[in-house]
Amino acid sequence: GWSSEKLAGKIGNKAERLASLNSSIGTMETLEGSTQVYSLSHTGYGENGGVTLNTSTNVIDIKFGSTANFVHEMTHAGQFETGDVAFTNTGMSLLQDVYDETAAYKAQFGYSPSSVSGLTSTSVANSFGAITPAWVQGLKDATGSTPYAVGGSANTGLIPVNINSTRDALIQAYPWNAVKFRGLPANYNIRTLQGIYYKR
């Protein structure tokens, strides 16, 4: 049989997964009740999921390849609702940080642990606790690149940022873009920029 410790661990993991799934359902309800319009689309073969803004219609597209990937990308759409993510005038996301990605991978793990534990990183994420900012930064894509690492293609911030973050927080989050931010006023935040689409 199972030891009481092993049994408690299994029950604990199930309870965490249930709480995560309930949180994902709550996010879906928020999106469904939002004044923001969302669309769903499947990725093509070999494409990554993502959340983008159609700048002609202001509809946010949640693009996904599997149900587990949908839970991940839908979490990012929920981050738009809370002001943790915004969009540029070209429809690309802004303010994504490693904590946003950590939350999305945890939500995905809650739905399908194997869809996350099978990913290549610095360690195997076989529990919620193993999905950390460092684990996210170590994730490798199909080409072996680390998109969430410092300077990676995903332009992922190092600290939590949102539409109210000041210039100094943005410099801390994106030090590779510090030169661009330094000329801005100290009380600057992303909401003061023309053409930025965020939840009002």
Predicted regions, residues:
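Short pre-active-site segment immediately N-terminal to the catalytic Zn-binding motif
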Residues: T55-F70, L94
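Short, exposed beta-strand/loop patches in secreted or surface proteins that constitute
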Residues: N48-T55
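Metal-centered catalytic cores of metalloenzymes
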Residues: S20-T27, S34
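Long, low-complexity, intrinsically disordered regions
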Residues: S4-A8, G33-N48
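Surface-exposed, polar/charged faces of alpha-helical domains
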Residues: D84-G91
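Active-site or metal-binding loop neighborhoods of secreted/extracellular toxin and effector enzymes
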Residues: W2-S23, V51, G91-R200
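Active-site recognition of the HExxH zinc-binding catalytic motif
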Residues: A68-T82
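Solvent-exposed loop/turn segments at secondary-structure junctions
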Residues: G65-T67, D84, Y111-S112
